[in-house]
């Protein structure tokens, strides 16, 4: 299952998110989206977890949780059209 993680502090790294999500199960990948020209974080990321039940538990427990001074938005990612 692909997960959207938003409202992230700009200092958060992919390894930080990977560590948090691994508390709920296996994580295939984490990708923080950055501005092409400055390489600065846009404040959101996508993660892929193969087990839907583990991903759903992570979504339920992490959505609205505070991390690095900001309240995260965590939900199932909507595929591009």
Residues covered by each model-derived region:
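Intrinsically disordered, low-complexity RNA-binding regions enriched in Gly/Arg/Ser/Tyr
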Residues: 1-42, 48-81
